[in-house]
Amino acid sequence: MEFVFLGTGAGVPSKGRNVSAIALQLLEERGQTWLFDCGEATQHQILHTSVRPRRIEKIFITHLHGDHIFGLPGLLGSRSFQGGTTKLTVYGPKGIKQFIEVALLVSTTHVKYPLEIVEITEEGIVFEDNEFCVETKRLSHGIECFGYRIVEKDIQGALLVDKLLGMGVKPGPVFKRLKDGEVVELENGTVLDGKDFIGPPQKGRVITILGDTRYCEASRELAQDADVLVHEATFAAEDEQQAYDYFHSTSKQAASIALQANAKRLILTHISSRYQGDTYKELLKEARELFSNTEIATDLKSFPVER
C-alpha cells in the first residue's frame, strides 16, 4: 500500500503544485489503484509516476469543485484509449453522474470498459468486499463534500510451517488445505485441524482521506485511530478566520484533528499557492508543534503505508 500524491495544490494549479489528486496504490493487496479526486491535468501528472490508468479500479470524488473533478473526462477517455478493459467505478456527490455523462457525450468520448457511477446521497458504507470497507461522512465545506475512511480487513495469519515440519508433515496440497481451515486426516491416521496451524491475524490498516473542510467533528470521527490521516492545510494558523470564511482548515487545525483522533501519522495537502518556495515549511512547523508525526505532501511524492 502506497500513496502517490499527484496534485497537492489548492484552487488552481501553480508552478509548484497541481490541483488535487491522490493515488492509493493497492498493488500487493488487490493489483489495483484507487484514485481520490481528479483535478485538471491529473493524467499528465500520472505520466511521471508508476501509476497505470488501466489499473485504476475506483475513483472517489470528495466534492464537485473544479479543482477536484476537471481531470475526470480526460482520464476516463485515455484509460479506454490505452487499452483499459476492466470495470471502473466512480463514487461522488450527487451531480457527478451528470458531469461525467455530459462531458463524455459533448466530446463524443466513448469508453470501451464498463463504467459505473455511484452517487453518494447519505453517509455510511459506500463500498465493501472481503478485503476493504470504505465509509464516508459529510464534511463542512461550501458545497456537499465527503471524507473517506478506508479500512483494510484483518488478514489471516500465516501458516505455521515450522510446526508442521516438526510433526513430520511434508509440504504439499495438505498445507493449502490446512491454511484454508480444513480438518485434514493424514495417511497415518493423524487428524489435523487447520485452525491449530494458523498464526495470529495481521491487523488491517486504516486510511482516512478528507476533502476540503473546516475544522469539524466528522473529520475526527473519520480519522479515529487511523494509521494515516490525509488532511487539507490550505492556510497557516494566523489565517484561521480566513480559513473559516472559505470553508477550509489551517495546518494547526489538521494537527489538532490528528491528535484528537489518535491517528498515527498526518500528511498535509491542498496547500494554497500563497505559500511558495520554502514558505510552506511554516505550515509543517505549526502542525508539528501539536502533532510531531506530520509530513507535508508535494507533487509526485510517495508515502508507503507499512503494516
From Swiss-Prot:
Disulfide bonds: none annotated. It catalyses: Endonucleolytic cleavage of RNA, removing extra 3' nucleotides from tRNA precursor, generating 3' termini of tRNAs. A 3'-hydroxy group is left at the tRNA terminus and a 5'-phosphoryl group is left at the trailer molecule. It is an enzyme of class 3 (hydrolase). Zn(2+) 2 binds at D67, H68, D212, H270. Gene3D superfamilies: Ribonuclease Z/Hydroxyacylglutathione hydrolase-like. Its cofactor is Zn(2+). InterPro entries: Metallo-B-lactamas, RibonucZ/Hydroxyglut_hydro, RNase_Z/BN. One of its GO terms (molecular function) is zinc ion binding. Keywords: Endonuclease, Hydrolase, Metal-binding, Nuclease, tRNA processing, Zinc. Zn(2+) 1 binds at H63, H65, H141, D212. The active site is at D67. Binds 2 Zn(2+) ions. Its EC number is 3.1.26.11. Belongs to the RNase Z family. Homodimer. Zinc phosphodiesterase, which displays some tRNA 3'-processing endonuclease activity. Probably involved in tRNA maturation, by removing a 3'-trailer from precursor tRNA. This is Ribonuclease Z. The gene is rnz.
